[in-house]
């Protein structure tokens, strides 16, 4: 073996170093979203670096490095003439003018989560949230729900995140066997809308806190579903859940500690008729806790954001659902890091 071959055979630190500075790439994407780069390219089409920089008000010093880094990260395309353009994914999901926009959640990550995650070490040592609560500010969500404009923006962002999973769920669950569903913690109603559009025989209920009503009802009108979906206000811990053949809980359970998770599952079971179903979907961690990186990191994000929330495995969710009285419980992968747990009453 030559010296070169011997050196190449040694373990390399490259992977460690790349992961250690992975925030470089994350922040590059988040800044691009903040600047509206993808929206500008969707509007103006492919353009050279200088023209794009002028439109975005960027200094020339690092302009090409910034754009070419996005090319290398797979977030932009560059043709032989040196013009930059959106990828198909960027055009669909990062253009603010499109209903498929998911950048709202990235905007929140940039403004809030990025600095909060700088306190992860403290969170790991104390077990305490590192968001606004840490600094003595009012709870983020209390302020959010008191500000109609900000609330609408947040709920639209959640729709962008949930829509792809909802479309898969619309075909993965036997909706033909049921006549009604209620989305618990419905936000704008994006998940509910996707299912109702795919299954015209269904009637839907959106269940969330009272300030959500105008945003939900506006979205149902936009989707042509105002006659098939109604809003029921309520607090799912303090009030009874609405009655429907199917209850859906998406991105809900991971916000809470185990006792609260179990309470919500018991309340869902009590609200369902015999033969009714509960569908829970989240970024469920694989049972071996080795593969679903997003789910595991999301659980760390719950440490940053909540007093007791955590993400969970499919096996854990099934056990909680059985303890709450559900039968024929199963877990089914949907798409990406997301899976659903289904149980019958």
Regions found by a protein language model. Give the residues of each.
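Alpha-helical subdomain
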Residues: 2-78, 175-345
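Conserved Class I S-adenosyl-L-methionine-dependent methyltransferase catalytic core
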Residues: 6-7, 13-43, 54-179
């Amino acid at each position: 073996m030559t010296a070169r071959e011997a050196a190449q055979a040694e373990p390399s630190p490259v992977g460690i170093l790349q992961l250690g500075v992975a925030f470089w790439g994350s922040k590059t994407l988040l800044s691009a979203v903040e600047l509206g780069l993808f929206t500008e390219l969707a509007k103006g089409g492919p353009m050279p670096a200088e023209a794009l920089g002028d439109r975005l008000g960027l200094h020339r010093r690092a302009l090409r490095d910034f754009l070419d880094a996005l090319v290398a990260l797979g977030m932009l395309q560059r043709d032989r003439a040196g013009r930059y353009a959106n990828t198909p994914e960027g055009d669909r999901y990062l253009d603010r003018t499109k209903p498929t926009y998911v950048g709202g959640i990235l905007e929140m990550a940039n403004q809030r989560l990025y600095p909060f995650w700088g306190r992860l070490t403290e969170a790991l040592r104390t077990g305490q949230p590192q968001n606004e609560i840490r600094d003595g500010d009012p709870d983020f969500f209390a302020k959010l729900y008191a500000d109609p404009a900000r609330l609408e923006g947040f709920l639209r962002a959640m729709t962008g995140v949930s829509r792809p999973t909802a479309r898969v769920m619309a075909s993965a669950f036997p909706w033909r066997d049921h006549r009604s569903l209620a989305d618990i913690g419905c936000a704008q109603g994006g998940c509910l809308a996707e299912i109702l559009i795919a299954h015209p025989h269904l009637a839907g209920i959106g269940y969330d806190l009272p300030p959500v009503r105008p945003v939900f009802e506006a979205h149902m009108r936009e989707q042509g579903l105002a006659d098939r979906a109604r809003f029921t206000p309520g607090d799912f811990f303090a009030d009874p859940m609405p009655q429907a053949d199917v209850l859906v809980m998406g991105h809900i359970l991971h916000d809470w500690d185990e006792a609260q998770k179990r309470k919500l599952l018991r309340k869902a079971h009590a609200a369902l008729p015999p033969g009714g179903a509960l569908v829970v979907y989240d970024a469920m961690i694989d049972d071996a806790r080795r593969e679903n990186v997003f789910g595991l990191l999301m659980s760390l994000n719950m440490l940053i954001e909540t007093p007791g929330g955590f993400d969970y495995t499919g096996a854990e969710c099934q056990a909680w659902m059985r303890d709450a009285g559900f039968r024929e419980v199963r877990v089914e992968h949907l798409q990406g890091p997301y899976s659903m747990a289904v149980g019958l009453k």
